[in-house]
Amino acid sequence: MKILYYDCFCGISGDMNLAALIDLGVPKEYLMEELSKVNLNSEYEMKIERSVKLGITGTRVDVKLNESSHGEEEHGHDHYHHHRKLKDIEKIINSSHLSDKVKNISLGMFMKIAEAEAKIHGKSLCEVHFHEVGAIDSIVDLVGAAICIDYLKVDRIIASPVQVGGGFVECSHGIIPVPAPATTEILKNIPISTGIVQFETTTPTGAAILAVNVEEFTSKIDFSIEKIGYGIGHRDLEIPNVLRVYLGEQERSEKVEEQYILETNIDDMNPEFYEYVQERLFEVGALDVFKTPIYMKKGRPGINLSVLISEKGEKDVLDVIFEETTSIGVRKHKVEKIMLNRDFSKVKTEYGDITVKKSYYKGKLVKYKPEYEECKAIAKEKNISIDKIYKVVYRQDLN
């Protein structure tokens, strides 16, 4: 499995991301050729060069605008404030000759920033005027990111917790705290760290690249590193102003996720309540809920309630446990969940199309299962046994 890993020890910005991925191996000629399909070549020039920050050698990207009036992005290159709206950005991308995949990735990142800006300024998506995103160089940053990600053809993208910096920064709205409100909104439910330097180390553009493309945020590296790229930032800081990226190979074909188990022992709750509690836990994002009969002190029978969650699901699950059960304490365990690769397909039967889930181990199909809820609904509608529907699905696929 091919892995792209972002090591954001000094945050991430759009230009540093482009520089790091070029340094990793994306040919600059390929990037420039693809960017030319956006039909904005006359509005900017891209300078790509080798650079050094505190002894670390990497690639630096600088986008210079062919405009007389310039602003400045806090982390990197210049910005000219066109004040474009989302529909303008969408028109530019959709009218380009980029591949559909690159278009979709690009539009996803722009939408992420648009939603954040709309919420911060209390406006609808169609009303938002982009300052950072409306600038040509930010279009280059985000479309360029999509081009590079598509070129690398990785199976998974992972990132470390994101350093966002600290202090205050001046923008078109005045002096605002770091991380900027838009950056904070984009990075919701993503692990961050702050204050390593008094500077904006992560910009909204960089945050959107991570929020849209990264599947997992973890400091753990469980793959062999094959290539390393360094994207050099423009500002001199106390630490290396560098974005480091790894291209690696994970030997196991199974997907591994870090998850958590929250568990509590209960011996004084009405057992009728467990069904409701379980429903509420799933509603707030629990990945799994299970109950184990136990004997507690003084021989009292009880239940061990266990809830499997992702890192970002803890708060809502704890709210349900403490508000809906008699528990006054919860234990938390970090676990690794190893999952087989899987896909879904439709099987045509005499009762209609039914979804089946296929699971693979070491590249071989090892599990094949119809979706229970679909089979149950058909069984009720047709007044036939669910076992018969399962057999029809298996027989149809064998044929």
Swiss-Prot record:
Keywords: Lyase, Nickel. It is an enzyme of class 4 (lyase). One of its GO terms (biological process) is protein maturation. It catalyses: Ni(II)-pyridinium-3,5-bisthiocarboxylate mononucleotide = pyridinium-3,5-bisthiocarboxylate mononucleotide + Ni(2+). InterPro entries: Ni_insertion. The keyword Endoplasmic reticulum does not apply. Its EC number is 4.99.1.12. Involved in the biosynthesis of a nickel-pincer cofactor ((SCS)Ni(II) pincer complex). Binds Ni(2+), and functions in nickel delivery to pyridinium-3,5-bisthiocarboxylic acid mononucleotide (P2TMN), to form the mature cofactor. Is thus probably required for the activation of nickel-pincer cofactor-dependent enzymes. NCBIfam families: nickel pincer cofactor biosynthesis protein LarC. This is Pyridinium-3,5-bisthiocarboxylic acid mononucleotide nickel insertion protein. The gene is larC.
